[in-house]
Amino acid sequence: MMDSEAHEKRPPMLTSSNQDLSPHIAGVGDMKHYLCGYCAAFNNVAITYPVQKILFRQQLYGIKTRDAVLQLRKDGFRNLYRGILPPLMQKTTTLALMFGLYEDLSRLLHKHVSSAPEFATRSVAALLAGTTEAILTPFERVQTLLQDHKHHDKFTNTYQAFRALRCHGIAEYYRGMVPILFRNGFGNVLFFGLRGPIKESLPTATTYSAHLVNDFICGGVLGAVLGFLSFPINVVKARIQSQIGGPFLSLPMVFKTIWIERDRKLINLFRGAHLNYHRSLISWGIINATYEFLLKIV
């Protein structure tokens, strides 16, 4: 009953994905996209953090899922959510910027470069939003250190981890920024570019619940595919960011080292990718569905 009443009151928001997006970019001063992105990220991190921790151990050490789970069990329940503050701060801010800047930049580019195709302006907006997110690299950096059990005896919380990096200079906070730029920039272009077409290929939603399911499927499928494609980049990033001090090695050099360590086998490089696929499916399903749902009620 509530679904049908809502449908009668707000018909433009429950038709096609093109119609869904158009009213959301009403003005640069509109902050609801930032707020909805923030809340969607908070919801996602709180639910999926333990799975992310298992995945991280696999990426860093190339171990099997069972061994990663045993490591977490050995660490104890009190350490299960250890390190959640950096990803919570980083993810909420990152997704607020991702969705908010994308909408604002899309509008600005379309307004000032009206001769360019909409696909081009939206792609540039997605790329710029993704690269801007990289300013939050220090949070991802500290998250990596807190999740690595080798550093458990060096610091016990986020503040101590940030403090441990301070003596190495500001550049140490941004170690691993290059793979993050690649991942975020091109990932955003594909995510925002394919989100509309995928949603349009799904059955037309006529109720809030059906709309929520479509948004979950759309975000989940995109997140799973993009997460799988970017998995090797995240493996390299985890290795780079697990180091404190020392020389700053290039992305190709670190990749070569990992490739040799894992017997030059592609399957070993993707160890943990199946878990990442399912985690991304759930995470981005939650993010996209929460974001779109909040847009309708804010």
UniProtKB/Swiss-Prot annotation:
GO terms for molecular function: NAD transmembrane transporter activity; organic anion transmembrane transporter activity. It catalyses: NAD(+)(in) = NAD(+)(out). Gene3D superfamilies: Mitochondrial carrier domain. Signal peptide: none annotated. Keywords: Membrane, Mitochondrion, Mitochondrion inner membrane, Repeat, Transmembrane, Transmembrane helix, Transport. GO terms for biological process: aerobic electron transport chain; mitochondrial NAD transmembrane transport; NADP biosynthetic process. Its main location: mitochondrion. It is found in: Mitochondrion inner membrane. The keyword Signal does not apply. Residues 1-11 have a biased composition (Basic and acidic residues). The chain crosses the membrane at residues 36-56, 85-105, 119-139, 180-200, 216-236, 269-290. Residues 1-21 are annotated as: Disordered. It holds the Pfam family Mito_carr. InterPro entries: Mito_NAD+_Carrier (IPR052465), Mitochondrial_sb/sol_carrier (IPR018108), Mt_carrier_dom_sf (IPR023395). Solcar repeats lie at residues 28-108, 117-201, 214-297. It is a multi-pass membrane protein. Belongs to the mitochondrial carrier (TC 2.A.29) family. Mitochondrial membrane carrier protein that mediates the import of NAD(+) into mitochondria. Mitochondrial NAD(+) is required for glycolysis and mitochondrial respiration. Compared to SLC25A52, SLC25A51-mediated transport is essential for the import of NAD(+) in mitochondria. The transport mechanism, uniport or antiport, its electrogenicity and substrate selectivity, remain to be elucidated. This is Mitochondrial nicotinamide adenine dinucleotide transporter SLC25A51. The gene is Slc25a51.
